[in-house]
């Protein structure tokens, strides 16, 4: 991002969930103009990591947040499209490699069809609108969305992948402005994803079903 000049477009915050590759050394971060390094020390996985980042951004007064994975697979040159979406009043912008202008490069076969046939259809049904690429963490959220009392993303129920699924659908359910942004997601040739075990896959399906059944909604009259 620093080499591409992206760091000049917005403040950059790194939310670390336990990196051990040396990329978060203080001197390295300073040389890249990173504003803050947040380190998750408590329980939970991705959702806990994201809650930490969202909370910091809201407390610091930011009006919008763009999130992107740190694995180098996403097209950082697409970040201005997310910033433009936020500036135009969009509340939730989701990256998609499958819409016009997007590109899916070397996506593993099983992952491609799991998104197309399971993940995206279920979350589209839950959202009440068509969404094409629902597993991506490359997204933008408005302050209005995350701070809405009908959303409440900082609850402890969000620990693993629940928050990504929930926030994917909740904006549409509330009638907020939602768009998909064309991006490129590139996997190295021949890469076989190993991040999610068989047990993890069952857990993911359970999360999708709970999202579909609105089990992550706040328990109040406003939900």
Feature map (PLM): residue ranges:
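Short beta-strand/loop segment that forms part of the nucleotide-sugar
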Residues: 1-2, 9-19, 39-40, 68
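Hydrophobic helical membrane-anchoring modules
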Residues: 2, 16, 128, 152-223
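Residues at the C-terminal ends
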Residues: 6-7, 59, 87, 173
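Residues at the starts of beta-strands that form the adenosine-phosphate
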Residues: 10-11, 64, 177
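A conserved acidic beta->alpha catalytic loop
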Residues: 16-25, 72
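Acceptor/aglycone-binding surface of glycosyltransferases and processive sugar-polymer synthases
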Residues: 36-59, 76-157, 188-196, 202
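Residue-level signature of catalytic and energy-coupling elements of molecular machines
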Residues: 53, 71, 142, 171, ...
């Amino acid at each position: 991002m620093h080499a591409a000049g992206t760091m000049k477009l917005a403040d950059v915050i790194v939310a670390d969930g336990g990196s051990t590759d040396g990329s978060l050394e203080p001197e390295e971060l300073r040389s890249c103009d990173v504003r803050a390094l947040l380190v998750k020390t408590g329980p939970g996985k991705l959702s806990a990591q994201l809650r930490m980042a969202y909370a910091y951004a809201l407390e610091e007064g930011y009006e919008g947040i763009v999130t992107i994975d740190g694995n180098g697979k996403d097209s950082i040159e697409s970040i201005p499209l997310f910033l433009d979406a936020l500036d135009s009043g969009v509340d939730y912008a989701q990256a998609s490699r499958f819409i016009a202008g997007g590109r899916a490069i070397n996506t593993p076969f099983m992952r491609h069809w799991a998104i197309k046939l399971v993940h995206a259809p279920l979350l589209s049904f839950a959202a009440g609108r068509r969404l094409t690429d629902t597993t991506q963490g490359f997204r933008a959220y408005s302050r209005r969305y995350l701070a809405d009392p009908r959303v409440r993303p900082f609850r402890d129920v969000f620990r693993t992948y629940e928050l990504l699924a929930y926030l994917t659908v909740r904006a549409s359910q509330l009638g907020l402005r939602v768009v998909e942004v064309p991006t490129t997601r590139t996997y190295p040739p021949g890469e076989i994803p190993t991040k999610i075990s068989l047990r993890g896959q069952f857990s993911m399906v359970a999360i999708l079903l709970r999202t579909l059944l609105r089990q992550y909604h706040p328990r109040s009259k406003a939900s």
